[in-house]
Design a protein with these regions (language model features):
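Short N-terminal edge-element motif at the start of the domain
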Residues: 2-36
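Short secondary-structure junctions and interdomain/linker hinges
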Residues: 23-34, 108-111, 135, 139-142
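N-terminal interaction modules that seed assembly of large macromolecular complexes
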Residues: 26, 30-68
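Generic preference for hydrophobic/aromatic residues in regular secondary structure cores
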Residues: 41, 46-57, 77-84, 145-161
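Intrinsically disordered, low-complexity regions enriched in Ser/Pro/Gly/Gln/His and often acidic
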Residues: 45, 67-71, 169, 176
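Polybasic, proline/glycine-rich intrinsically disordered low-complexity segments
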Residues: 60-121, 125
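Extended, Lys/Arg-enriched charged tracts that mediate electrostatic binding to polyanionic substrates
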Residues: 125-133
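Glycine-rich, aromatic-bearing surface loops/beta-hairpins
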Residues: 134-187
């Protein structure tokens, strides 16, 4: 039996899809699609908030000079180091994350108990990935050909597992392999 219930799951999927669509469109209005290489959604372990961020080649090139060579592959994919994201754009753009999605997560959090937390967490994560996937399917493939999509978990021991799992669900196999090997590759 579902912890969240079908209504909350569908509402979360629809709003995540809408949020990704609107924010990615905004990113593409500011940056050339060939310049954008990463777009991520990030959430905390307790599923209490969801944010977004996108990175560009030129931003990474500027950022990486501030780090030793061995750290550069990590900052390339670390969303706080990304070019643009939640809180850095007009409120109208972030509104779906700050209002609609936040309200859904607030309501969903009232359903958590000690006995159902892992199932609750899995349902939230799966719904986010499903909404993300719906959005990507509706974006012009020419504009996403260089972009790797993934979900990250903030300050969690499971971050890399979620990032790899979501990248596999959201990208072509080639893009997934590139992402999976991101820390072994040259910056």
């Amino acid at each position: 039996m579902s912890v969240l219930g079908n209504y909350i799951i569908q509402d979360l999927i629809q709003n995540v899809s809408k949020g990704v669509t609107e924010t990615f469109k905004f990113v593409l209005e500011r940056y050339n699609s060939n310049e954008v290489f990463a777009y991520t959604l990030y959430i905390d372990d307790y599923c209490s908030y969801l944010g977004w961020a996108a990175n560009t080649i030129s931003h990474y090139e500027i950022e990486k000079v501030n780090y030793p060579k061995e750290d550069q592959p990590f900052i390339k994919w670390y969303y706080p180091q990304f070019a643009i994201g939640l809180g850095e754009v007009p409120e109208k753009i972030d509104s779906i994350f700050n209002n609609e999605i936040q309200n859904i997560l607030n309501d969903a959090n009232t359903l958590i108990s000690e006995d159902n937390f892992e199932q609750y967490q899995a349902e939230v994560y799966d719904s986010i990935i499903e909404g993300f996937k719906k959005a990507i399917e509706n974006i012009d493939k020419k504009k996403t050909k260089n972009v790797i999509f993934f979900v990250s978990i903030v300050d969690s021991d499971n971050t890399e597992i979620m990032e790899n799992y979501s990248a596999e669900q959201l990208n072509s196999y080639d893009k997934f392999l590139t992402f999976k090997n991101r820390f072994q590759s040259k910056p």
